[in-house]
Amino acid sequence: MVSLYLENGLFLQVQSFGASGTQVGELVFNTSMSGYQEVISDPSYKGQFVIFSMPEIGVVGANSKDDESFFSSAGILVRHYNEFFSNSRADFSLSAYLKERGVLGICGVDTRSLIKTLRHHGCLMMVASTIEHDKNKLEEILKNAPRISHTPLVASVSTPKIITHQRATFDFKTLDYKPFDEKNSHKTIAVLDFGAKGNILNELQNVGLKALIYPHHTKANELIKAYEKKEIHGIFLSNGPGDPLSLQQEIGEIKQLIGAKIPMFGICLGHQLLSIAQGYPTYKLKFGHHGSNHPVKNLETNAVEITAQNHNYCVPEAIEKIATITHRNLFDNTIEGVHYKNAPIISVQHHPESSPGPKESHYIFKEFVKLLENFPTRE
């Protein structure tokens, strides 16, 4: 059994199918119909519980190859968990996977009702425990826990040292993995790691970019010197968890990088940090965008792209003063992509690498390559 207590006073006792323990986190919902392993292992979900709107979870099991990172969400909530899985690539059940990673698995939940609660109240903090079942004690645990906006999550999911991304990537044409070959790398970029997904790094690699992954607290001067020495040709700012406004030290360094006119590309949290660094702070959405079925309009082509999304914060409309808005969300008209006028920078709020999700926005990685080619390193 697992007991849940939400900050709105809701108390539930339901079934457990994952790890044991007590976890506190922010409750969000995800509308993806598949790809639960990639969601669970996405570093951006660090400190959060994820409700899956898809009622049946577990039917394809899990494996050792599709993880986005070594990090996980606090737990998942599902309507019905199916222990019997069928997939040629599966190595073990979802239950075994959750236990191995220390993730709470919660089933038998009226997920439709909970999602309606979040839509009405917004994201809520929650405590879940397989150990403590007293409502008053759980309420006390939640009361004393820090809010997610006050928790330094990025430091716990960033690389501690500079490493090179060299990973075999899955080829959807051959349905097999192709090894990394440095001969295919035409440019080298620095990745500021705020909690980068593995498949973002894979896509950078697939378009001919060698990715050097730097810690989140890397000083701007170090990157500027590397750019001037032609050791790197540009910078990528990754996705990651938490409130972007809590990263004040990183924002200060990014401001210097913008001033140095280095070509840059940001996704999700990276997109938000680029906005804040130029004086346009983000605001929090009521319940965020989480799922692989969000329509986005490309304002340059008028094409509608179905995208993967995972964020609770958004850049403001005022960003239009210094940037051209390139993409908009068709659910709520929020900004999904910009091209800055004052620097060689592009950024998007959604996830063009998908994983899970459709591949309709993959072209954005090639646009970054074009940006690097149009703004060569200094002589």
Curated annotation (Swiss-Prot):
Describe its partners and assembly state: Composed of two chains; the small (or glutamine) chain promotes the hydrolysis of glutamine to ammonia, which is used by the large (or ammonia) chain to synthesize carbamoyl phosphate. Tetramer of heterodimers (alpha,beta)4.
Q: What is its EC number?
A: 6.3.5.5
- SUPFAM superfamilies referenced in this protein's UniProt entry, alphabetically: Carbamoyl phosphate synthetase, small subunit N-terminal domain, Class I glutamine amidotransferase-like
Q: Which domain of life is it from?
A: Bacteria
Task: Give the UniProt family note.
Answer: Belongs to the CarA family.
Name this protein carries in UniProt: Carbamoyl phosphate synthase small chain
Q: Is Nucleotide-binding found in the keyword set?
A: yes
Q: What does this protein do?
A: Small subunit of the glutamine-dependent carbamoyl phosphate synthetase (CPSase). CPSase catalyzes the formation of carbamoyl phosphate from the ammonia moiety of glutamine, carbonate, and phosphate donated by ATP, constituting the first step of 2 biosynthetic pathways, one leading to arginine and/or urea and the other to pyrimidine nucleotides. The small subunit (glutamine amidotransferase) binds and cleaves glutamine to supply the large subunit with the substrate ammonia.
Q: Where is this region: CPSase?
A: 1-184
Glutamine amidotransferase type-1 domain segment(s): 188-378
Q: In which pathway does it act?
A: Amino-acid biosynthesis; L-arginine biosynthesis; carbamoyl phosphate from bicarbonate: step 1/1; Pyrimidine metabolism; UMP biosynthesis via de novo pathway; (S)-dihydroorotate from bicarbonate: step 1/3
Q: Which reaction does it catalyse?
A: hydrogencarbonate + L-glutamine + 2 ATP + H2O = carbamoyl phosphate + L-glutamate + 2 ADP + phosphate + 2 H(+)
Q: Which organism is it from?
A: Helicobacter acinonychis (strain Sheeba)
- Could you say which enzyme class this protein belongs to? ligase
Q: Which GO terms describe its biological process?
A: 'de novo' pyrimidine nucleobase biosynthetic process; 'de novo' UMP biosynthetic process; glutamine metabolic process; L-arginine biosynthetic process
Q: Does the keyword rRNA-binding apply?
A: no
Residues bound to L-glutamine are 44, 240, 242, 269, 272, 310, 313
Instruction: Name the residues annotated as catalytic in the UniProt entry.
Output: 268, 351, 353
Q: Please name the Pfam families in this protein's record.
A: CPSase_sm_chain, GATase
Q: Which GO terms describe its molecular function?
A: ATP binding; carbamoyl-phosphate synthase (glutamine-hydrolyzing) activity; glutaminase activity
HAMAP family from the UniProt entry = CPSase_S_chain
- Which gene codes for it? carA
